[in-house]
C-alpha cells in the first residue's frame, strides 16, 4: 500500500528559482456621493445604531391625528414609513450577518411603523368611503 505522503509530494507544484509572483493592483475605494439614494438605508451612514440610540424612537401615529392631514402629507408620511422600514430591515440583516441578537426595540420600531402605515390606509379608506357615499347621495338628489 502506498503512503499518502508520497502521493502528496508528487502532486506538489514546483516553482522555479527567480520566479516573481504577480502583485495585485491596489484599488482605491470608489467615491460615493453624500446624497446617493442608498444612504437612505443607513442612519448617519452607519450600518448599526449605537446602543445608546437603539431604544430611542417615537410612537405610531393614530388615525385621529392622521384625519387632519392632507393627502400630500399622508403620501409623504407613507414614504417616510417605507424608508424607516427599509432602514430597520437593513439593520436587522446586518445584525444577522454579524450573528448578533436582534434587540427588542428593533421589533417594537417595526411594529410602530406598521401601525402608522395601517392607520394611513384606514384614513384613506374612510375618505374613499365618504366620497363614494357623497357621490351616491348626490346622484339620488339629482334623480328625484
UniProtKB/Swiss-Prot annotation:
Transmembrane portions of the chain: none
Record keywords: Mitochondrion, Ribonucleoprotein, Ribosomal protein, Transit peptide
Species lineage: Eukaryota, Fungi, Dikarya, Ascomycota, Taphrinomycotina
Its biological purpose: Component of the mitochondrial ribosome (mitoribosome), a dedicated translation machinery responsible for the synthesis of mitochondrial genome-encoded proteins, including at least some of the essential transmembrane subunits of the mitochondrial respiratory chain. The mitoribosomes are attached to the mitochondrial inner membrane and translation products are cotranslationally integrated into the membrane.
Pfam family, one: MRP-L47
Cellular compartment(s): Mitochondrion
Gene Ontology annotations for the cellular component aspect, listed alphabetically: mitochondrial large ribosomal subunit; mitochondrion
Gene Ontology biological-process annotations: mitochondrial translation
Listed name of the protein: Large ribosomal subunit protein uL29m
An annotated Gene Ontology molecular function: structural constituent of ribosome
InterPro entries xref list: MRP-L47_sf, Ribosomal_uL29_mit
Transit peptide region: 1-68
Family: Belongs to the universal ribosomal protein uL29 family.
Gene3D superfamilies per record: 6.10.330.20
Quaternary structure annotation from Swiss-Prot or TrEMBL: Component of the mitochondrial large ribosomal subunit (mt-LSU). Mature yeast 74S mitochondrial ribosomes consist of a small (37S) and a large (54S) subunit. The 37S small subunit contains a 15S ribosomal RNA (15S mt-rRNA) and at least 32 different proteins. The 54S large subunit contains a 21S rRNA (21S mt-rRNA) and at least 45 different proteins.
Chief localisation class: mitochondrion
